[in-house]
């Protein structure tokens, strides 16, 4: 059981911090950057839960909005698990190369495969993609998009020192970004939101100047 009685130690005042084994490294160290990005993903997932819980799951007449309740249940369960897994991953990533303590509980193949199983279940409920999706939507959907992009940044950072970490950790993060993409689409569909699709340049409007002029003319 973790017991923390003091947070401020002054040990990081000069730009250094400790790895799990107590060794000191600069806060600009690539491994510390990775740990921080992992924490950033976790915080964004917390924001997804906040945004999801803001959506009313009752109709004006008091009846239950079944699809909204389902989104809340799935996100609370899945993201709650993911946040703990990311904490496990962050602890592992904060270890020096090839010096993971035997007592540490690590992300395993079952955790990684579970992401694929959940993706497959969600995809069964979705229409096939016919274009790229632009990152927009309501609070939970837009925040899921952001979490996905930060997860990709985490993956890119990990690749930079992949020889110093377990291949399974990198596999897990790669799958996690895909998982977030599919959950974003599933959440959008369950909330009856239209996805904003990419429009090729030849089909896009040239600008908004004409629209502004028409609006001004109709005042």
Show where each model-derived region lies:
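Phosphate/pyrophosphate-binding loop motifs in nucleotide- or prenyl diphosphate-using proteins
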Residues: 1-219
């Amino acid at each position: 059981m973790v017991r923390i009685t003091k947070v401020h130690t002054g040990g990081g005042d000069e730009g250094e911090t400790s790895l799990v084994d107590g060794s000191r490294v600069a806060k600009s160290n690539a491994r510390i950057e990775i740990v921080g990005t992992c924490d950033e993903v976790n915080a964004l997932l917390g924001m997804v839960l906040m945004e999801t819980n803001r959506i009313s799951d009752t109709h004006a007449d008091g009846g239950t909005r079944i699809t909204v309740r389902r989104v809340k249940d799935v996100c609370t369960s899945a993201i709650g698990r993911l946040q703990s897994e990311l904490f496990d991953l962050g602890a592992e990533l904060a270890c020096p190369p090839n010096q993971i303590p035997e007592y540490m509980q690590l992300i395993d193949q079952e955790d990684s495969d579970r992401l694929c199983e959940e993706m497959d279940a969600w995809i069964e409920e979705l229409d096939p993609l016919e274009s790229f999706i632009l990152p927009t939507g309501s609070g939970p959907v837009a925040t899921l998009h952001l979490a996905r992009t930060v997860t990709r940044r985490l993956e890119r950072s990990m690749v930079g020192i992949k020889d110093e970490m377990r291949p399974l950790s990198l596999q897990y993060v790669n799958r996690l970004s895909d998982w977030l993409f599919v959950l974003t689409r599933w959440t959008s569909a369950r909330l009856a939101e239209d996805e904003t699709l990419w429009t090729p340049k030849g089909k896009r409007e040239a600008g908004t100047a004409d629209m502004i002029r028409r609006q001004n003319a109709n005042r």
